[in-house]
From Swiss-Prot:
The keyword Metal-binding applies. Keywords: Lyase, Magnesium, Metal-binding. It comes from the Bacteria. Binds 1 Mg(2+) ion per subunit. This is 2-keto-3-deoxy-L-rhamnonate aldolase. Mg(2+) binds at E153, D179. InterPro entries: Aldolase/citrate-lyase_domain, HpcH-HpaI_aldolase, KDR_aldolase, Pyrv/PenolPyrv_kinase-like_dom, Pyrv_kinase-like_dom_sf. It comes from Salmonella typhimurium (strain LT2 / SGSC1412 / ATCC 700720). The keyword Magnesium applies.
Amino acid sequence: MNALLSNPFKEGLRKGDTQIGLWLSSTTSYMAEIAATSGYDWLLIDGEHAPNTVQDLYHQLQAIAPYASQPVIRPIEGSKALIKQVLDIGAQTLLIPMVDTAEQARQVVSATRYPPLGQRGVGASVARAARWGRIDNYMAQANESLCLLVQVESKVALENLDAILEVEGIDGVFIGPADLSASLGYPDNAGHPEVQRIIEACIYRIRAAGKAAGFLAVDPAMAQKCLAWGANFVAVGVDTMLYTEALDSRLAMFKSVQSVSTAKRSY
């Protein structure tokens, strides 16, 4: 099978395109496919805070595959063993949470690359990623098409941001607003002026270093701010939150209920 691997999401980042995404926390392939038909540039399948197994992630990758939306998987953490599994099921773009140091970033880069560039285990003949051994020269293609994003979401990570940005193999840095605001002493308040100032400065530093800058904003006004500041891959909602808002809004048409505004909620 003489197929060439491609990663449109990574190519978009290279070109500087702005890519609008959606967070998938519902854990179902059915909801993932519905989202894929909406036209978002990318869909984040969340394995950190949503109760997804590796097989759940696999089924959602399958559901998204026929459509133009590009899947991004966030595993629960950046261990070498888990990264190997997620790559083998066909993920080409990963978002690794809680990366605090350049050394952590280098370890993640190594876990995602086949030797001699890294330490990813070899098992292409039994992996969906290689179409069970049918993609010629898969290992070299996989190293090239992989897109690796890391999350900066703590005071320690902020202190080490410049060093993280220097790590070869990191394609983009994502600012985690909920954990970051808590780490800075403003829990559940990513809208605090000091947090906002830091987010804007981080986005500028990331882009100045030649990397892509990402963000999740459940408030549309905050999403627009981040885009104006230079973030070029921004998730503008979470499927489960949008679902609860729609349910509450519909019920409010017929019963007296209190609905929670998106602008007052954080992820």
